[in-house]
Regions:
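An exposed acidic His-Trp-rich patch
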Residues: 74-128, 321-376
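Short S/T/G/P-rich N-terminal loop/turn motif that feeds into the first structured element of a domain
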Residues: 1-46, 59, 67-72, 107-302, ...
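Elongated alpha-helical scaffolds
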Residues: 39-81, 85-90, 299-304, 308-319, ...
Length: 419
C-alpha cells in the first residue's frame, strides 16, 4: 500500500484571516465531531492539520497537511464527498478561490490540485500499513489479548504450541477476523529493493565521476566555509511567550502523539538554496531505505516531511510523532544531529555551524530556542489512531503476520511476548 504525503498551500485574504482562524478554532474544539471536515469519515486518512501562518514580508497562508493511502485522485474524491461544504467555507477565505454560493466539484478539486506542494524529503514510520489495516490489526491484538487473559484465568495454559493453536482456532471462529489469515507484505519486493538500488547507483555514479566531483567538492567546501564565516550571526533567541500559545496544541490527554509545524526562512543567495536542495535530495534518498520504523535511529516519527515553499525562500517542516516535543527534539539532537544540522544550517537564526553539519543542533538550548521561534501554531490537528505509537503499530503487524506461520518453541515464545 503506497502512502502519500502532501500539503495544499494557499494564500489567505488578510481581511478574512480572523474569520478563518475562528472557523478553525471551532473545528479544533471537537476535531473528530466537527462538521466542517468530518475527519473520521475519511477512511484513507492517517493524519491531517490546518495551519494559518502569518509572517513578516509574506502574505498570510493556509497550510493544509494530508497524509493518506493511495494516490491523490481517490483521496480528493473522498474529501469532496464528505467535506465539500466545509472546504468551500474554508477556501472562500482565499483570494484566488473561485467565488460561488455553493461548492462546484470541478472547480474545488481543480483548485486543490493547483495548490498541491509535494515534499522535497519525507519519512513514513509504518511503511505499507493503510489506515484501515492499522485499525484492524489493533482490534485483533486487543481481542487476542483478552482471549489469552481468559486462557490464563482458567488455568488451562499447557504447552506454548497448544496456546498458539487455541489462539489460531479462536481467530478462525470469529467472522470479524476473516481478513487476518491473508497477509499482504508491507512492501512489494520492488518497493523494498528499488530505494536501495537507487542509493547504490547514486554512490557508483559519484565514484565514477569522482575525478570531476572532487575538485568541485573542494570548491564547494571553500565557498561554504567562506559563507559560514561571513554570514550575519544568528539572533540570540530565547523561549518567549509564543510557547504558551504553542503548547495549547501539545500533550493532549489520552493522546500519545504530537504535531509540529515549523516554517523557516532560507538564508539568501543561490549557494544556500542550492545546498539545501541538494541536502534534502540526499536525505530523501536515505529516508526511502528507512522502512523499519526508524529514521536515523529515531523510532517515533509517523509521518514527517520537508518542503521548500515560496520559490525556495522558506522551508516547511511538518511532523506527526510520538511523545513530547522535548523528547522528540532530544532524539534529533542525540541521534540525527548531522542530518538535522545539514538541513537547518541553511536557514536563518539556526545555531552557528561549521562545514554544514558540525556544531549547530549540538548546541541544544539554542537549537530548541530556534525551533520554538520558527514553530507555527497548529490550528487544527487530526490523528486517525491517536493512541497508537509507531512501535505499537509495528508490533500489531508482527502479531498478525506471524499468526498462521510455522514457528518453533523459541519463536512462539517471542510471539506470545508481543501481547
Amino acid at each position: 500500500m503506497k502512502q502519500t504525503i502532501l500539503t495544499f498551500i494557499t494564500k489567505v485574504n488578510p481581511a478574512k484571516v480572523s474569520d478563518l482562524k475562528a472557523l478553525l478554532e471551532g473545528m479544533a474544539k471537537d476535531v473528530e465531531g466537527n462538521a466542517v471536515i468530518p475527519f473520521p469519515k475519511l477512511k484513507l486518512l492517517h493524519f491531517a492539520s490546518l495551519v494559518v501562518n502569518e509572517a513578516p514580508d509574506y502574505d498570510p497562508c493556509l497550510v493544509f497537511e494530508n497524509n493518506f493511502d493511495g494516490p491523490l485522485d481517490p483521496y480528493l474524491e473522498e474529501l469532496y464527498l464528505h467535506a465539500s461544504e466545509g472546504l468551500h467555507q474554508i477556501y472562500s477565505c482565499c483570494p484566488d478561490y473561485p467565488v460561488a454560493s455553493a461548492p462546484d466539484k470541478a472547480q474545488l478539486l481543480s483548485y486543490l490540485r493547483a495548490h498541491v506542494v509535494h515534499p522535497n524529503a519525507y519519512h513514513i514510520g509504518n511503511v505499507g500499513r493503510s489506515a484501515e489495516r492499522t485499525h484492524q490489526e489493533d482490534a485483533l491484538r486487543d481481542s487476542l489479548e483478552d482471549f489469552l487473559d481468559g486462557v490464563v484465568a482458567q488455568g488451562n495454559i499447557g504447552p506454548l504450541a497448544s496456546i498458539r493453536q487455541k489462539v489460531q482456532a479462536f481467530v478462525k471462529s470469529q467472522p470479524l477476523f476473516t481478513w487476518a489469515a491473508k497477509v499482504e507484505p508491507r512492501q512489494t519486493a520492488s518497493e523494498h529493493f528499488m530505494p536501495r538500488l537507487n542509493l547504490v547507483i547514486a554512490g557508483l555514479i559519484a565514484l565514477l565521476l569522482s575525478p570531476l566531483l572532487i575538485p568541485l567538492l573542494l570548491v564547494w567546501v571553500i565557498m561554504l566555509r567562506w559563507t559560514e564565516t561571513h554570514e550575519a550571526p544568528p539572533a540570540d533567541l530565547s523561549i518567549d511567550t509564543n510557547v504558551k500559545n504553542l503548547v495549547k496544541r501539545e500533550d493532549f490527554p489520552h493522546i500519545v502523539q504530537n504535531h509540529m509545524c515549523h516554517i523557516s526562512i532560507v538564508k539568501p543567495g543561490a549557494f544556500r538554496r542550492g545546498t539545501l536542495r541538494g541536502v534534502l535530495r540526499l536525505i530523501n534518498l536515505i529516508a526511502r531505505t528507512s522502512d523499519k520504523g526508524e529514521l536515523s535511529g529515531i523510532p517515533s516519527i509517523h509521518f514527517a516531511h520537508w518542503s521548500l515553499i515560496d520559490n525556495g525562500r522558506r522551508l516547511l517542516f511538518v511532523s506527526n510523532f510520538d511523545g513530547s516535543w522535548e523528547n522528540y527534539l532530544d532524539d534529533f539532537i542525540d541521534k540525527a544531529s548531522s542530518g538535522l544540522t545539514g538541513i537547518w544550517s541553511n536557514t536563518v537564526d539556526y545555531p552557528k555551524t561549521r562545514f554544514l553539519i558540525l556544531d549547530g543542533s549540538r548546541d541544544g538550548s539554542r537549537f530548541k530556542a530556534a525551533a520554538r521561534a520558527k514553530q507555527t501554531y497548529t490550528n487544527v490537528w487530526y490523528s486517525a489512531y491517536k493512541q497508537l505509537t509507531v512501535q505499537t503499530i509495528d508490533n500489531n503487524s508482527s502479531i498478525r503476520e506471524d499468526l498462521f506461520t510455522s514457528l518453533d518453541d523459541s519463536a512462539t515464545r517471542d510471539w506470545l511476548l508481543r501481547f
